[in-house]
Amino acid sequence: MSKATGFIKEFRDFAVKGNAIDLAVGVIIGAAFGKIVDSLVKDVVMPLVNFILGGSVDFSNKFLVLSMPDGYTGPMTYADLTKAGANVLAWGNFITIIINFVLLAFVIFWMVKAIYFARRKEEAAPEAPAAPPEDVTVLREIRDLLKDKQGS
């Protein structure tokens, strides 16, 4: 067997067997789950937080201009300044991302706790004892008949 054929066989074994497929499925499901959690944070949790705090918890437009291009007279928004080549320290965006991360981690934590709680409930439910196999049932009937014959 040539080295190339051996390499191809080894790669095929790696890709088809083992954990590669499990990993691929996990990544795909993880990406989809990430979108669900991201939507939960952006569309449900953040509006509630903004309502409770009575304003907007969005610091993304907070920034510090470190240097301005010569002769710039345009709008003083982050997007316009960076487009014009200004050196801008976007500290507000960083704070917003940290807040979103903490909220996202909190939501994931509670979702995982709920899943574990549901699993524990399933495990705690006692299973009904399995019916004995047919041969055991027949043997018990024979035993009982023999006891009855010996007793009478």
UniProtKB/Swiss-Prot annotation:
InterPro entries xref list: MS_channel (IPR001185), MSC/AndL (IPR037673), MscL_channel (IPR036019)
Protein's UniProt keywords contain Amino-acid biosynthesis: no
Molecular function terms from GO: mechanosensitive monoatomic ion channel activity
Chief place of localization: membrane
Subcellular location: Cell inner membrane
Superkingdom of the source species: Bacteria
Chain ranges passing through the membrane: 21-41, 44-64, 92-112
UniProt KW keywords: Cell inner membrane, Cell membrane, Ion channel, Ion transport, Membrane, Transmembrane, Transmembrane helix, Transport
GO cellular component: plasma membrane
Membrane topology: Multi-pass membrane protein
Reported function: Channel that opens in response to stretch forces in the membrane lipid bilayer. May participate in the regulation of osmotic pressure changes within the cell.
Assembly with partners or alone: Homopentamer.
Family: Belongs to the MscL family.
HAMAP family xref list: MscL
Name of the protein in its database record: Large-conductance mechanosensitive channel
Organism the protein comes from: Bordetella pertussis (strain Tohama I / ATCC BAA-589 / NCTC 13251)
